Amino acid sequence: MERPNLPKELPEDIEDKKEAAQGWFQSLRDALCAEFEQLEDELAGPLSDQTPGRFVAKDWQRENGEGGGGRMSMMEGRVFEKVGIHTSTVYGEFSPDFRSQIPGAEEDPRFWASGLSLIAHPVNPNVPTVHMNTRMVVTTSQWFGGGCDLTPMLNRRRTQEDTDSVLFHRAMQIVCDRHKVADYQRYKAWCDEYFYLKHRNESRGIGGIFFDWLHSTEEAGGWDADFAFTRDVGRAFSMVYPRIVRSNFNETWTEEDRDEQLIRRGRYVEFNLLYDRGTIFGLKTGGNVESILSSLPPVVRWP
């Protein structure tokens, strides 16, 4: 999607808005960690004789304690082979070669960004991998961005008619339809366009929503409306994905299913390293490399 021309002005209470956004991302992180640990506890099918996983949190700082930092929460368990739920709040200056890619950064290279990112790689091939992130960015402009997308591991489940796909898309449509500043059809198409592996001519998953540069006019509700939608995206995800996990995580699987899962994970690696905007942003702004690359699956296979 073409990048819009965002207003080059910040509200007088921008610091209060930053604090509110940062606080929300941190509270959502804590709620999601609790929910994912609950899923670990509930498993009753294969591997239920193993110990449920628990998150291990690790705080980090940029540039010798300057420029902000974040918290990296990782879990390896019997439901999730690897799941990371991370928050960060960073600030500084964009490098000269990166400024032209960020709205408002060419006039002034200083930036502030806060957000949450989640990626889950389940053990059971019947349970789809998922990615979700929401963020607020401030330069000489300010905006929200984010999205959720679902990646089934098994080809027989990679259809728009699959129960998981229908449920996930419906949840995303409902949350968009509740907010005048959101546009479900546009965000759905944007997701399909964004999460596409051009070199393989295939989609990463079955889609979801993706949005960026969300800066609504005061007539449309302004920052408050954008923030309300961003919060609701997190809430919608926290309801729909655990439901999908619970409907699949007690199913059995075969060695062929596992092989298919590992090959599909390889596509995930390819996308994140070649195309993902968040990965590039994090590496370009001195983010925590361990946290940025934690989105990669733990075990992968290329045929």
Swiss-Prot record:
GO biological process: protoporphyrinogen IX biosynthetic process
GO function terms (MF aspect): coproporphyrinogen oxidase activity; metal ion binding; protein homodimerization activity
Active-site residue numbers: H131
Catalytic activity, EC: 1.3.3.3
Residue numbers marked as site, Important for dimerization: H199
UniProt xrefs under InterPro entries: Coprogen_oxidase_aer, Coprogen_oxidase_aer_sf, Coprogen_oxidase_CS
Binding-site list for substrate: S117, N133, T134, R135, G286, G287, N288
Signal sequence bounds: none
GO terms for cellular component: cytoplasm
Coiled coil: none
Listed PROSITE patterns: COPROGEN_OXIDASE (PS01021)
Cofactors, names only: a divalent metal cation
Subunit structure: Homodimer.
NCBIfam families per the UniProt record, alphabetical: PRK05330.1
Family assignment from sequence similarity: Belongs to the aerobic coproporphyrinogen-III oxidase family.
Name by which UniProt lists this protein: Oxygen-dependent coproporphyrinogen-III oxidase
Organism: Rhizobium rhizogenes (strain K84 / ATCC BAA-868)
Gene: hemF
